[in-house]
């Protein structure tokens, strides 16, 4: 066999041209200083804002400050192994976390690494944690209810899917309890929940996870935990990581609920990082962009339209809207809602639920102040039967609060005022609710109907909750079809109303409570 030299050279040329080898060009820099998880790096000329940086021993950081001759970065995780003179490489990637249904039922840290001891999570996709919120055209108005199962909220401060509703109050007023009850209430409703714990004690987070497991809620819940022992950077980024995990479901035409517990501690962590990066402090020593810190996070909670979902899924999901509902929690100091961070978040959200220490200590739990709690968009999403029945309860409460103040000084009251005070006392008593016992729609409808129509006016205040419980037990036993109709149609027809009235009257005559 004779080889032609020209053929050999042509063959070699074609083989060399076919090699698609490209040089992996990555900038390398040197650590100049390390302080409290913040490092300054010299020599990184083409790094991006928010880019992941690779340190020795498989430690990663995020570039936050891009200055003329150095880069300020936060180290994610343990920074004790990073020292002056270490080589740092750029990765060309923005910080991202694993997303997908595989995360349900698991407890992960800010980076999506499991910390519950149940082994690795086999997720198929990752997504960046900092994303632009959906535009105005991509959104749909809030029109579907998100039942919390809490009487005071569902009747007077209704929440819709895609809404941002702030839970605000001092420490130890039951803020987390409201959030956990809301998660438990989503069982069987097709809502994926994400609970983001920021700066909480590890024991507190463990208690929440245990309660969710006890009530079968972990199967549709993802817990993102950045405890008080984690670095400030991990606490500051946890909320964005959790939001990305929730957006995965929203963008695929599903409904998700995210709870940030709490954004006060996230703001503290961001303040700490900013001051260590030597950014100029502003009011209360917060950096100038602390409003943007929360607004860009909470704007990502939205209800998106069918076109957005169809485009995002490349036509795989059609005719479905997706939603991400946010319940941020803010802790106030001595009831001061006019502080910097509370006023910021109040202005960003679509309403707020105020929890008061005085009410909590008086035994009114959940300690919701109905007078100053408001839902700006939830009214349009409220269930028909609840909307019809809840109008009177807010009026009764408002008049009761007003009259109760005068009644302290007035010795003799006319009959109308006395009746109003008695009705108000029963409404306050009826809105009390034990923890971990969220109500279904029919239960709330029956409760509201009973108080609105005066069936409780002659029941002793101390017996109101016992009356309510016994009445529901009797309805379950004798009027299961009525309950099912109210639950299915979310309406109270004239026939159903007549049957309910007869059932309550019968219970008052023969029932034991």
From Swiss-Prot:
It is a peripheral membrane protein. ATP binds at residues 169-176. Its EC number is 7.1.2.2. The record marks 373 as: Required for activity. InterPro entries: ATP_synth_asu-like_sf, ATP_synth_asu_C, ATP_synth_asu_C_sf, ATP_synth_F1_a_nt-bd_dom, ATP_synth_F1_asu, ATPase_a/bsu_AS, ATPase_F1/V1/A1_a/bsu_N, ATPase_F1/V1/A1_a/bsu_N_sf. It catalyses: ATP + H2O + 4 H(+)(in) = ADP + phosphate + 5 H(+)(out). Signal peptide: none annotated. The keyword Isomerase does not apply. Its main location: membrane. F-type ATPases have 2 components, CF(1) - the catalytic core - and CF(0) - the membrane proton channel. CF(1) has five subunits: alpha(3), beta(3), gamma(1), delta(1), epsilon(1). CF(0) has three main subunits: a(1), b(2) and c(9-12). The alpha and beta chains form an alternating ring which encloses part of the gamma chain. CF(1) is attached to CF(0) by a central stalk formed by the gamma and epsilon chains, while a peripheral stalk is formed by the delta and b chains. PANTHER family: ATP SYNTHASE SUBUNIT ALPHA, MITOCHONDRIAL. NCBIfam families: atpA, PRK13343.1. This is ATP synthase subunit alpha.
């Amino acid at each position: 066999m004779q080889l032609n030299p020209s053929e050999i050279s042509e063959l070699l040329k074609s083989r060399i041209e076919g090699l698609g080898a490209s040089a992996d060009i990555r900038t390398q820099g040197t650590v100049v200083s390390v302080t409290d998880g913040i490092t300054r790096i010299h020599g990184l000329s083409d790094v991006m804002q928010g880019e992941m940086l690779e340190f020795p021993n498989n430690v990663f950081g995020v570039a936050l400050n891009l200055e003329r001759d150095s880069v300020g970065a936060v180290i994610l995780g343990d920074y004790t192994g990073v020292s002056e003179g270490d080589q740092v490489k750029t990765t060309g990637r923005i910080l991202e976390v694993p997303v997908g249904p595989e995360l349900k039922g698991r407890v992960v840290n800010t980076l999506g690494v499991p910390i519950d001891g149940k082994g690795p999570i086999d997720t198929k996709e990752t997504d960046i944690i900092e994303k632009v919120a959906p535009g105005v055209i991509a959104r749909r108005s809030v029109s579907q209810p998100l039942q919390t199962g809490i009487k005071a909220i569902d009747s007077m401060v209704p929440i819709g899917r895609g809404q941002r509703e702030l839970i605000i109050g001092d420490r130890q007023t039951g803020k987390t309890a409201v959030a956990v009850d809301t998660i438990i209430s989503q069982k069987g409703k097709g809502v994926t929940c994400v609970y983001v714990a920021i700066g909480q004690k590890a024991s507190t987070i463990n208690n929440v996870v245990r309660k969710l497991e006890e009530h079968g809620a972990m199967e549709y819940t993802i817990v993102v935990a950045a405890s008080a022992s984690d670095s400030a950077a991990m606490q500051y980024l946890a909320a964005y990581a959790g939001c990305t995990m929730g957006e995965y479901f929203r963008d695929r035409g599903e409904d998700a609920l995210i709870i940030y517990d709490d954004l006060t501690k996230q703001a503290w962590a961001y303040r700490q990082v900013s001051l260590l990066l030597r950014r100029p402090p502003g009011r209360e020593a917060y950096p100038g962009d602390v409003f943007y810190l929360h607004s860009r996070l909470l704007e990502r909670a939205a209800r998106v339209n069918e076109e957005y979902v169809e485009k995002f899924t490349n036509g795989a999901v059609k005719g479905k809207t997706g939603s991400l509902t946010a319940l941020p929690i803010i802790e106030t100091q001595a009831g001061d809602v006019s502080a910097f961070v509370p006023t910021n978040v109040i202005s960003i959200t679509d309403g707020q639920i105020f929890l008061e220490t005085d009410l909590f200590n008086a035994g009114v739990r959940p300690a919701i102040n109905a007078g100053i709690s408001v839902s700006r968009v939830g009214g349009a999403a409220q269930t028909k039967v609840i909307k019809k029945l809840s109008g009177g309860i807010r009026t009764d409460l408002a008049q009761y609060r007003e009259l109760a103040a005068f009644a302290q000084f007035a010795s003799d009251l006319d009959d109308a005022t006395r009746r109003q005070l008695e009705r108000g006392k029963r409404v306050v008593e009826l809105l009390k609710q034990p923890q971990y016992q969220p109500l279904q729609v029919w239960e709330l409808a029956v409760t509201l109907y009973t108080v609105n129509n005066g069936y409780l006016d002659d029941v002793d205040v101390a017996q109101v909750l016992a009356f309510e419980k016994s009445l529901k037990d009797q309805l379950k036993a004798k009027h299961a079809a009525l309950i099912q109709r109210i639950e299915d149609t979310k309406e109270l027809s004239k026939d159903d109303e007549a049957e309910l009235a007869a059932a309550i009257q019968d219970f008052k005559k023969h029932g034991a409570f």
